[in-house]
């Protein structure tokens, strides 16, 4: 993979307790959210879960690994793609 590039980070969790804010705060510690594409959120049919796609300006594989590691370790994150 070539860097820098815009890269989508997909995260899923329960639709409560400002999950979106939590995910953004973790990602923004490591990267800049791409302003044009930004954030796309989708709530499940029953409203219990939310999936977020956050497009970031990725500078390196190490940066992506750090983002995935921190998000995956958080108890409120159920799944990542």
Where are these regions (language model features)?
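Long, contiguous binding/interaction regions
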Residues: 1-51, 55-81
């Amino acid at each position: 993979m070539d860097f820098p590039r815009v890269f989508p980070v997909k995260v899923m969790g329960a639709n409560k307790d400002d999950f979106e804010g939590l995910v953004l705060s973790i990602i923004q510690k490591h990267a800049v959210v791409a302003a044009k594409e930004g954030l796309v959120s989708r709530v499940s049919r029953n409203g219990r879960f939310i999936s977020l796609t956050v497009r970031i300006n990725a500078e390196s594989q190490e940066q992506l690994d750090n983002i995935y590691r921190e998000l995956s370790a958080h108890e409120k994150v159920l799944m990542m793609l």
